[in-house]
């Protein structure tokens, strides 16, 4: 069985990270959460009170505090900037609401995309994000474009937040997700869009295992 590159793209809370982690584990591939990388930069920007126009200062911060990943004892992914564990802080609402603006900065994307491509060269990788199939891994053997209704995605994010103890209002989440969809698909640099050769998969009404099985079946055809 050959190792392949799997690119999973889609809007906020479409289930990308959840299914990507399971697929990577099942195939013994590396999982790279690119969204966590943009969240890490956003977290640093907020922590240092940097605006989106302060690009040089942001890039300098990235050099001083490189983003890296680790594993907890239970096998969960940990995210670090420098040697500081920021796994939980990057999921806070404040970071979520600012990440689209930071991710739209061309120089930040360029730096992170280059890092993502470097990691992917090892082969046997599952990567999820907004522009994996179109920009980061245009040569990936399998590209998936995951979508779901705004209502369903808000419901999922709501349950995740409650489980993490993050105070959340469902109606506010719906508005935030719709606004983020617009920002992500209308930005100038690497907008969210389906790659021409991507498999379109609407996950509305499907459970996680059903989505995983559909993607694994597509992957196995290419191995």
From Swiss-Prot:
Cellular component, GO annotation: cytosol
GO biological process, one term: pyrimidine nucleotide metabolic process
GO MF annotation list: ATP binding; CMP kinase activity; dCMP kinase activity
Documented EC number(s): 2.7.4.25
SUPFAM superfamilies in the record: P-loop containing nucleoside triphosphate hydrolases
Cited Pfam families: Cytidylate_kin (PF02224)
Catalytic activities: CMP + ATP = CDP + ADP; dCMP + ATP = dCDP + ADP
Superkingdom: Bacteria
Compartment(s) where it occurs, according to its Swiss-Prot or TrEMBL record: Cytoplasm
Keyword terms of this UniProt record: ATP-binding, Cytoplasm, Kinase, Nucleotide-binding, Transferase
Broad class of the protein's primary localization: cytoplasm
Chain positions recorded as ATP binding sites: 10-18
Family in the record: Belongs to the cytidylate kinase family. Type 1 subfamily.
Protein name listed in UniProt: Cytidylate kinase
Organism: Streptococcus pneumoniae (strain 70585)
Name of the coding gene: cmk
């Amino acid at each position: 069985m050959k190792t392949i590159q799997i690119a999973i793209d889609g809007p906020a809370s479409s289930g990308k990270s959840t299914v990507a982690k399971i697929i990577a584990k099942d195939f013994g591939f590396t999982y790279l959460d690119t969204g966590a990388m943009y969240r890490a930069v956003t977290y640093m920007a907020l922590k240092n009170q940097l605006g989106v126009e302060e690009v040089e200062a942001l890039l300098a911060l990235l050099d001083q505090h490189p983003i890296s990943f680790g594993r907890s004892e239970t096998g969960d992914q940990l995210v670090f900037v420098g040697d500081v564990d920021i796994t939980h802080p990057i999921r806070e609402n404040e970071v979520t609401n600012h990440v689209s603006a930071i991710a739209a900065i061309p120089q930040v994307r360029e730096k992170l995309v280059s890092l993502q491509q470097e990691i992917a060269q090892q082969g046997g990788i599952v990567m999820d994000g907004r522009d994996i199939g179109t920009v980061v891994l245009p040569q990936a053997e399998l590209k998936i474009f995951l979508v779901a209704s705004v209502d369903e995605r808000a419901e999922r994010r709501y349950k995740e937040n409650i489980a993490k103890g993050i105070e959340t209002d469902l109606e506010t989440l719906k508005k935030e997700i719709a606004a983020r969809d617009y920002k992500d698909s209308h930005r100038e640099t690497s907008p969210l869009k389906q790659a021409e050769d991507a498999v379109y998969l609407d996950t509305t009404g499907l459970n996680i295992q059903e989505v995983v099985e559909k993607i694994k079946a597509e992957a196995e055809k290419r191995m």
